[in-house]
Amino acid sequence: MAAVRTASLLCGLLALLALCPEGSPQTVLTDDEIQEFLEGFLSEFETQSPPREDDVEAQPLPEPTQRARKSKAGGKPRADAEAPPEKNKDKEKKGKKDKGPKAAKHLEGSTRPTKKPKEKPPKATKKPKEKPPKATKKPKEKPPKATKKPKEKPPKATKRPSAGKRFSTVAPLETPERSLTSPSNPGTRELPEERGRTSLNTWQGQGEETQVEARQHRPEPEEETEMPTLDYNDQIEREDYEDFEYIRRQKQPRPTPSRKRIWPEPPEEKTQEPEERKEVDPPLKPLLPPDYGDGYLIPNYDDLDYYFPHPPPQKPDVGQEVDEEKEELKKPKKEGSSPKEDTEDKWAAEKNKDHKAGPRKGEELEEEWGPVEKIKCPPIGMESHRIEDNQIRASSMLRHGLGAQRGRLNMQAGANEDDYYDGAWCAEDESQTQWIEVDTRRTTRFTGVITQGRDSSIHDDFVTTFFVGFSNDSQTWVMYTNGYEEMTFHGNVDKDTPVLSELPEPVVARFIRIYPLTWNGSLCMRLEVLGCPVTPVYSYYAQNEVVTTDSLDFRHHSYKDMRQLMKVVNEECPTITRTYSLGKSSRGLKIYAMEISDNPGEHELGEPEFRYTAGMHGNEVLGRELLLLLMQYLCHEYRDGNPRVRNLVQDTRIHLVPSLNPDGYEVAAQMGSEFGNWALGLWTEEGFDIFEDFPDLNSVLWAAEEKKWVPYRVPNNNLPIPERYLSPDATVSTEVRAIISWMEKNPFVLGANLNGGERLVSYPYDMARTPSQEQLLAAALAAARGEDEDEVSEAQETPDHAIFRWLAISFASAHLTMTEPYRGGCQAQDYTSGMGIVNGAKWNPRSGTFNDFSYLHTNCLELSIYLGCDKFPHESELPREWENNKEALLTFMEQVHRGIKGVVTDEQGIPIANATISVSGINHGVKTASGGDYWRILNPGEYRVTAHAEGYTSSAKICNVDYDIGATQCNFILARSNWKRIREILAMNGNRPILRVDPSRPMTPQQRRLQQRRLRYRLRMREQMRLRRLNSTTGPATSPTPALTLPPSPTPGSTSRLWEILPTTAAGWEESETETYTEVVTEFETEYGPDLEVEELEEEEEEEEEMDTGLTFPVTTVETYTVNFGDF
């Protein structure tokens, strides 16, 4: 009977299943109906057959579905396992219609514990086929798994927001019940196709096919445990994030336990697996990588469900998660890892934790917005004139002198502000429709604008606010906005200080336009634009700009950096370099110099000395940096064996002084490039302009020339410094005193000072000479005839005018951009006429300059080199400027070997110091150094050169100068002469001529008697002098008093410095006949001849005066004359 009943039951079930439609089998036959149907027939079957353990266990089949729902709703799985079957049945009736089978399918492809119990309803259908014990055993073993592991995985859900978001898409109809807080596998795919598949799997769960599928699904979790370590997405993450590679690889096996919950396994295996995983998996929990499946990206539309978790299940989970994470730091890391790696792994794990039960910190950093570093771009070249005049346009201009081309930063007005060269761009009217634009001729990323007011001593004009617009075609303009309206930029508060207005976000365009809104005074402004070029430049001249290949330190150097760099160069090339100090500045900073020579520290005979100075004005920084680069270049090239540099170093003693005004540089460097005005840092700390603070020797020389004292009474070279500049209270800067002392110690031949603000070479004279009345008259007549004013222009020229022009052209022609006529002048018109050279007095007349003082006080020919329009260029401009000036700097140094050189000695080969070397046709000589050597720079040609010294006979010879580099050797040997004695005799006679007595001329008896007395007196004086010389003890003679022994000398060399003439003259007399002269003076003051009385001698002299036919000799002259002749 039991077999018949079972057969009838099976037939009934098949009939019911056949009536169910294929599209919705769950709606026709629900689990509750199947449960009631089975219980009804099984109760009858149990009365006839003895109860089995499997049958008893088959009764709580609906419990897994109830647990799954509770886990979705946030309940505790253990409490569901202990719930009575009656309550479970009620819950099954409410929610098992559609969601049970669908969840079961998801559980097959995922590791989430909540979905696993939903596969049990189709397994319940296996019981009529005598396989209910298998179905009953499996759900009983699964509930404890579901209760143990959901507690461990809620923390994973808190760490991975993406996993929680994906699960909510599975059942949108029951979101309040399915809002999971612990999704176990974030990589499950929840597609509509999967939902359909789950329903099909539940329908196929009839008969033995369900057992086959269950068996087929059993090995899947084992394979899935290995898959995370070979995930393709994880491999990509390891390449991008190498720091997290070790942690991510070990944390991937974690999804395996959740997947194994779905399939029934013996409890022994389950207990073994967590033990093995505890050794490896627990430290990997907090950094479990997301599993994206086949690459499908789940949409993030369930953020609210995740970020507002349910409090009941999360509170215990969060605590467990934090405790587990704290324990993970104490667990060992990789095998064989060093202690340093272990500490780094611990910190990496701590950084990636989120102690607030949220997503990992590593993921937050990827998603969070961080401030982007601002792009710092250099100026496009408004101030440096790399932007040409035709690239600057404006809506209007007040007049040509205030046009758009004058709107460059730091543009200076001329002496007359009403001319064509004023100090800003000014609009024609004061309407707000005015603008000024710049065409960069390339696509540029603009980052800011620097504005400045008008340079004027009368007006106070500057722009206070403005708009900025951009365009690519100069037709359609886009205004810069702040997101709501056009952004207003604030400009200047005075006319001199530059103000930077940065753009919050860079803009890429070709044109930039400034629209002034408000201003002070008139609408006038100067500006500079900051931008980085995006596309190559189309300017015809910029295409030829070379790029440096030298490995040098291209950056601005502070005082400490400069000192450190010079120290490094000295250490790299100790055999050819030496660092020393000229003195100190007003603030106590040392003025450093570097000597480069094959024998540093010593002056070699025949080797000329050259100097480069820079930084006289602290804000003119380009020269300072070029000299620092030149130091490095000479050192590197000398070590590399560059023959040109080696010859230059071996034959020349080079002195480089990068900063003569370190105090001024520190002031200018605080503001930085482009932000200091024209005069900031120009003066010293005491307020002096070093270039114009030297003694004025031009006025002294020109006054002597007007009196015809040159070269007899006043020399034309090596003029002494006036006393007013030497007194301690003189208004001379500390730096100038140190420079003068340095110039007098070293016999410099050629030098140049590097400046900024213009692009030209200036040569002396720098002081304008007032023309005389005759010159003015001649100039007026020449102008009336239409001729050039040659006489007036010649008044500003030095005797070495042709040589100075040669030297200036040698630098300007070697410079890459100085002789380009289309560039024009920086501040005003081009005074050089495209040649790059100009006379200082014609261009910018000044008195007391460094160039004029060096030319008149020493042998050094000094020029001023103005390197560029921008005094303080941006750091990015240094490589370009180095290439523009490198060849010119080397070429100018080589000019020191042009001309003649030699040594002046006497007949015994002893060098003669302070000998004068003069060239016929050039009214300017040079002096020999302490070793008797000299250098005279001359243009190619043939010259008659004369060497003369005091006490020696002059010597002259013809010297030829070639075009090639290399001075012609011209040595002189001077013989001693009696001219020194003759000048002494004349001085003793009061510098009056000594008349010669003709013996053939008849004399009166009285004259003869007087002559005899004089002869007797001379004889007696001679005898007395001889006796005194024999009786006198040997020893140094006393020097004569200056009033009696210092005669005026008609030679050029005798009127040198007054403070040096006295000791020099005394020393010369001591070497010759000082004793004799001293004896005579003493005798004159104390005693006279024994046989001749003074009264008689005076009477005789009176008689001679009356007769007018004899000679009248003063008493002193007679005594001196007699003593001198007595020495022969």
Swiss-Prot record:
Residue spans of biased composition, Basic residues class = 113-163, 249-261
**UniProt keyword terms in alphabetical order:** Calmodulin-binding, DNA-binding, Glycoprotein, Repressor, Secreted, Signal, Transcription, Transcription regulation
Glycosylation site residues: 520
Determine if Secreted is one of this entry's keywords. yes
Q: Which InterPro entries did the record assign?
A: CarboxyPept-like_regulatory, FA58C, Galactose-bd-like_sf, Peptidase_M14, Peptidase_M14_domain
Region listing for Interaction with PTEN, in residue ranges? 547-977
User: Residues annotated as region Disordered?
Assistant: 40-368, 1027-1056
Biased segments, Polar residues type: 178-187, 198-209
Query: Which residue windows does the record flag with biased composition (Low complexity)?
Result: 1030-1044
Q: In which tissues is it expressed?
A: Expressed in aorta.
Q: Where is this region: Required for transcriptional repression?
A: 933-1128
User: What about PTM?
Assistant: Phosphorylated by MAPK1 in vitro.
Per the record, what is one GO cellular component?
extracellular region
One BP annotation, GO = proteolysis
Matching entries from Gene3D superfamilies are given as: Carboxypeptidase-like, regulatory domain, Galactose-binding domain-like, Zn peptidases
Whether GTP-binding counts among this entry's keywords is no
Query: How is this protein organized at the quaternary level?
Result: Interacts with different types of collagen, including collagens I, III, and V. Interacts with GNG5, NFKBIA, MAPK1, MAPK3 and PTEN. May interact with calmodulin. Interaction with MAPK1 may stimulate DNA-binding. Binds to DNA in vitro.
What the protein does comes down to:
As a positive regulator of collagen fibrillogenesis, it is probably involved in the organization and remodeling of the extracellular matrix. May positively regulate MAP-kinase activity in adipocytes, leading to enhanced adipocyte proliferation and reduced adipocyte differentiation. May also positively regulate NF-kappa-B activity in macrophages by promoting the phosphorylation and subsequent degradation of I-kappa-B-alpha (NFKBIA), leading to enhanced macrophage inflammatory responsiveness. Can act as a transcriptional repressor.
The entry's free-text remark on domains says:
The F5/8 type C domain binds to different types of collagen, including collagens I, III, and V.
Q: What is this protein called?
A: Adipocyte enhancer-binding protein 1
Q: Where does this protein come from, organism-wise? A: Rattus norvegicus (Rat)
